[in-house]
């Protein structure tokens, strides 16, 4: 698999403030890569350096095999971009604006603009200035997707969209990936990353604090384990859990012949299973962690909770 985006030792400073601290990032072609982080983590700065909107203080960047600075207009035509703060010409109608942008971005197949607008529920006949924030966001999505770019760079792309349109957007992202396009998706809506991304990087204070498949973040997270066991004393189970590593919020209670156990496991749940295995396990429930829990836990452990 080829690499669509690669950064090495990427730094960006604004005076005395350092926004990016030596960012090393690799995005494989034909994948959806999620970038998660709180406000001020460096997500937008990262995207803008990839597009040569701002220049890094130091470090190397390669996008679609070229330097963003040297690639110029030819490289930009291969990229679809939705900025976090969308500014559109308000004096024209949506259809006219998109046709004008199509002349800049490159060939757009006949009917594509209308098809995308229909999927997103966008009225192209209305002047842009009369559109709501959500409908302006739909315009931004259409202009990014309409020329079938090799790379989609999407900064908080569902801002202002209702749940049904968000679902359609996620379908568009998956279709783009299936067609061989690469998608870099920056979002604080963690369910989007969970549903759409193959891999993810978590940014905190300009640094990557975790990176890998979305499933790996779930594994690293906190899980709640509940069990009912027999044939063992509650004190024995409680002592075993107290001696195990990575186990928190333990609650062990006897109820007749039953012992009810509840505990939080950080990462692997095996220590909990071992602790209750002295008895007969009658019931066992493991609450699979949501990505949101994983990310909040990572923020907390890296002093970057927001």
Question: Could you tell me what each predicted segment is?
Answer:
Residues 264-306:
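C-terminal coupling/interaction segments
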Residues 2-7, 12-210:
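ABC transporter nucleotide-binding domains
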Residues 11, 95, 190, 234-235, ...:
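Alpha-helix N-cap/helix-start and coil->helix boundary motif
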Residues 169-264:
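ABC transporter nucleotide-binding domain
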């Amino acid at each position: 698999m080829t690499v669509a985006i690669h950064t090495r030792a990427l730094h960006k400073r604004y005076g005395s403030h350092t926004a990016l601290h030596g960012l090393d990032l690799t995005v494989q072609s034909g994948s959806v890569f999620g970038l998660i982080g709180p406000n001020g983590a460096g997500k937008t700065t990262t995207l803008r350096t990839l597009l040569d909107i701002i220049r890094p203080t130091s470090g190397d960047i390669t996008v679609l095999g070229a330097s963003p600075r040297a690639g110029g207009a030819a490289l930009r035509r291969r990229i679809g971009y939705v900025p976090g703060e969308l500014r559109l010409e308000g004096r024209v109608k949506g259809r006219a604006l998109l046709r004008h942008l199509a002349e800049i971005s490159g060939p757009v197949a006949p009917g594509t603009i209308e098809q995308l607008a229909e999927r997103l529920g966008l009225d192209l006949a209305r002047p842009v200035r009369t559109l709501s924030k959500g409908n302006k966001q739909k315009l931004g999505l259409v202009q990014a997707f309409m020329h079938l770019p090799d790379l989609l760079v999407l900064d908080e792309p569902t801002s202002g969209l209702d749940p049904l349109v968000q679902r359609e957007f996620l379908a568009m992202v998956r279709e783009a990936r299936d067609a061989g396009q690469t998608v870099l998706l920056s979002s604080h809506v963690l369910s989007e990353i969970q549903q759409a991304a193959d891999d993810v990087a978590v940014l905190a204070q300009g640094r990557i604090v975790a990176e890998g498949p979305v499933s790996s973040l779930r594994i690293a997270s906190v899980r709640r384990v509940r069990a009912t066991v027999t044939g063992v004393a509650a004190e024995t189970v409680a002592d075993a859990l107290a001696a195990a590593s990575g186990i928190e919020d333990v609650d062990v209670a006897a109820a007749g012949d039953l012992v009810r156990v509840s505990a939080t496991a950080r990462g692997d749940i095996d220590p909990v299973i071992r602790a209750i295995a002295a008895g007969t396990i009658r019931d066992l429930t493991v609450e699979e962690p949501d990505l949101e829990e994983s990310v909040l836990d990572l923020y907390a452990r890296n002093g970057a909770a927001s």
